């Protein structure tokens, strides 16, 4: 009987030790995972056009980790002619300007043109309608459709708009269709906020990601075009 009692005691002790070890291992694993994530929350105001009919050839790049912004002239090949909006093809091409040296900043995550946003090799999805706060995003969603940037014609030169036929310059650029949904066209050269309150999630090549909530597309006066948003950036160490 004594031997059985001793054996039972040792068995229970081993089980408790195992459970405790598992709990500690899980705690350490969760702690390690949290330590591997570096979370930054910021607000960004990106001025895109201070005066009408300007800055069509500019991109504003932002490093979401530091918040640093840099404005650069579009360096890709420009094609002059008429764009068929139904087919997305250029017609009546009059001239081209070859691609110039890449002038993108060494570090950037997303960039904004007056009418188009793009990512640095990232993919974008829009969180469900029940997700309305950045605080709700603590990890990447398990499902959903991620959309990469797509080739598009970017309007960069409006100088020939009044010619007959109109001949404007377009860059062979890229834009992200999902990220573009923060605004919608409201008329010739006019846009308005769309998907208000929705959270846009961008995942980058290194595994880091950002949750973005757009707040405005003009400045406080309503005269200058800018994109404003709150965001949470999660960097993998």
What annotation goes with each model-predicted range?
Residues 9-16:
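Bacterial N-terminal signal peptides
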